[in-house]
A protein has these predicted regions:
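N-terminal maturation segment of proteins
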Residues: 1-199
């Protein structure tokens, strides 16, 4: 769950920080620094910004099935089987997301979430279905239809759920302290906000 995601990143940072620089090449030092920076940025969104509970965007990227459609890493039948496996896991993921997101959502987040989750619901039986139309295995096509129907229903339910409570007009702003932390932890820019504002 989310706690595991946080703990894994903290442990990875600790493991990287205890490496003896004397044993590292310049390239290794750079890669270690980059790794720590990326993990600190991910921790910011997970914890301080609390996106798993506040922002549907935290989930839409991971749910995007485009890799099975747009990237010909294997033949269509193999990718179709992978898509089916993905689709069969969508209902459980949708339930977890529903449990995590705290309503009401800010208006901008709600619109994004409904467009994303609702868009997936349409995509499964539309463009995704069309992408594998040339696969002649009827049993596989039937399995695809069943899996994507359940996945689409789960995503549409999620889109409806987050809209079941009227959105707030605010709640999306980080505030000065968190914004400063975001810039420092995700962009490695440790500059006072007043100076950043002056720079433009």
């Amino acid at each position: 769950g989310l706690k595991l995601a946080v703990d894994q990143r903290k442990q990875a940072i600790e493991a990287a920080e205890v490496l003896d620089e004397a044993d590292l090449s310049d390239n290794d030092k750079y890669e270690r620094s980059y790794l720590i920076h990326v993990l600190q940025g991910e921790l910011f969104w997970l914890t301080e910004a609390d996106w798993p509970h506040k922002n549907p965007d935290y989930y839409t990227g991971a749910l995007d099935p485009n890799v099975y459609i747009a990237r010909p890493y294997a033949d269509a039948e193999t990718r179709m089987k992978a898509f089916i496996k993905y689709a069969k896991n969508v209902p459980a993921a949708a339930r977890q997301i529903e449990a995590n997101l705290q309503l009401p959502l800010p208006e901008t987040y709600l619109k994004y979430g409904q467009a994303g989750f609702g868009g997936f619901a349409e995509y499964y039986g539309g463009d995704a279905k069309a992408a594998f139309a040339d696969v002649k295995d009827e049993a596989l096509q039937a399995e695809f239809d069943a899996a994507t129907a359940e996945a689409a229903a789960a995503m549409q339910h999620l889109a409806d759920h987050i809209g079941s409570v009227p959105a707030t007009k605010d709640g999306y702003a980080l505030g000065a302290e968190k914004f400063s932390d975001m810039v420092r932890l995700t962009e490695a820019v440790d500059v006072p906000l007043a100076e950043l504002k002056a720079i433009g």
